[in-house]
Structures are given as C-alpha cells and as structure tokens.
Amino acid sequence: MEDPAGRRVDYGDRRFDEHDLAPTPLAQFQAWYSDAVEAGVVEPNAMTVATAGADGVSARTVLLKAVDGRGFVFYTNQRSRKALAIAHDPRVALLFTWHGTHRQVAVRGTAEEVPRAETEAYFASRPYGSRIGAWVSEQSRTTPSAAALHEREAQLRERWPDTGSPDDVPTPPHWGGYLVRALEVEFWQGRTSRLHDRLVLVAADGPARLDDPAPWRTERRQP
C-alpha cells in the first residue's frame, strides 16, 4: 500500500464565518446536506455513530433516516452492540463526513427510542428485501457461515412471501428507531494550511430543539 503520510489534499479556501450560519442548527444542517447531494457525495446520509457500552467504546456507519426539530433518527436491531451500548449509556456522537465538499458535521447528544408507531411506519416503507433482512440477521452475533444466513433468509421469504403490500412482513419486536437529541453541533469547513473553520453550536442547558435558535450559542474553535 502507499504511505498514507504522503497523501495530501488541497481543501481550497472556502470560508465559513459566523455571518454564514443559518438561523438554526437544523437549517444549517439541511443547507450543507443539500450541498453534499448536489456535489454528488455518495450516501450523504451515512454517519458514524459512536457509543460507549459496558465493554468499551465502538463506532460504526449507520444511515440517517430522518432529521427534524427533535434531532437525528436512525434504525437498528435493538439487540445489536450499538443498542446495548445506548441502553448502558445514552450519550452518543454522530459524524457526517462529506469529502466532496470538504465538510464535516459532528453531533454530540443523547439517544432515546422513537415511538413504536414511528418505527412501524418507517419499517413499512422499506423494500421487501430489507424487511426480510431485519428478521434474518441477529446483528452483532456470530454465525457459522454466510450460507446459514441465506438459508434463514429463504425460510423467511417462504413464511412471508412478497405480496407487494407494505404489511406482508411484520415489524420485528427487537427492531426500532433511535432519536439523537443534540447538545452540540459542529460545522467544520476544510481550508488550506490546516486553518479550517470550526463553528460549534452549543446548547448549555441540555439537549435542545434544532429548529429553535434560542437555546444555542456559537463558539469558534481552533482547528
């Protein structure tokens, strides 16, 4: 492999100043997300989710499925390592990395389960194969082989055939959504000479709504 120490990327000199901030964290996130989509970033909704469980810290890539005034929503098997970690300690961190725009958004907050009705509505919107897959995988557990997973998939497809209905596969009782309520949202803009812009919105009194400007103060942090 190449020596990673020798790889350099010129981030350009696009500035991100305090006067460039949108009125709320939600509006700013939506603006940058739209820029990432327009720049052709692959899966701009991909985010790293970091947790701290009884067995230590861990991180993985998960897809954002909703963002609104409440916070950021993702779905997962609730017996997975990440879900067990959240049950142990609800404090989490999210990181969106958009290489095509030389930007990052880092979020610190707390995770909680979304209402069951919200989980079931989202599950029904998923493609048939994804709904079956949620039943097939006992996420984070070992399996004797890939063939064992495919055999279970075939059994479940026979049990719940694809009828074209969103109700043909029930929502697993161990599968659900998590809402991350933000305490801090950092907007990072890459610039030349490592003098990047880092504007951080901080909610001093606990998790706050992303669509309300009142609870948030702005800090500029050194890169």
From Swiss-Prot:
Q: Which residues bind FMN?
A: 60-65, 75-76, 81-82, 104, 139-140, 188, 198
Provide an example Pfam family for this protein. PNP_phzG_C
Top-rank taxon, per record: Bacteria
For this protein, what is the EC number? 1.4.3.5
Q: Where substrate is bound, by residue?
A: 8-11, 65, 122, 126, 130, 194-196
Alphabetical GO biological process terms: pyridoxine biosynthetic process
**Keywords, alphabetical:** Flavoprotein, FMN, Oxidoreductase, Pyridoxine biosynthesis
Cofactor(s), by name:
FMN
Q: In which pathway does it act?
A: Cofactor metabolism; pyridoxal 5'-phosphate salvage; pyridoxal 5'-phosphate from pyridoxamine 5'-phosphate: step 1/1; Cofactor metabolism; pyridoxal 5'-phosphate salvage; pyridoxal 5'-phosphate from pyridoxine 5'-phosphate: step 1/1
The free-text note explaining how the cofactor binds reads:
Binds 1 FMN per subunit.
Q: Does the keyword Flavoprotein apply?
A: yes
Q: Name one GO molecular function term.
A: pyridoxamine phosphate oxidase activity
Q: Which reaction does it catalyse?
A: pyridoxamine 5'-phosphate + O2 + H2O = pyridoxal 5'-phosphate + H2O2 + NH4(+); pyridoxine 5'-phosphate + O2 = pyridoxal 5'-phosphate + H2O2
Record-linked HAMAP family: PdxH (MF_01629)
According to its UniProt record, which protein family does this protein belong to? Answer: Belongs to the pyridoxamine 5'-phosphate oxidase family.
Q: How does it assemble?
A: Homodimer.
Question: According to its UniProt entry, what is the function of this protein?
Answer: Catalyzes the oxidation of either pyridoxine 5'-phosphate (PNP) or pyridoxamine 5'-phosphate (PMP) into pyridoxal 5'-phosphate (PLP).
What this protein is called in its record is Pyridoxine/pyridoxamine 5'-phosphate oxidase
**Species in which this protein is naturally found:** Kineococcus radiotolerans (strain ATCC BAA-149 / DSM 14245 / SRS30216)
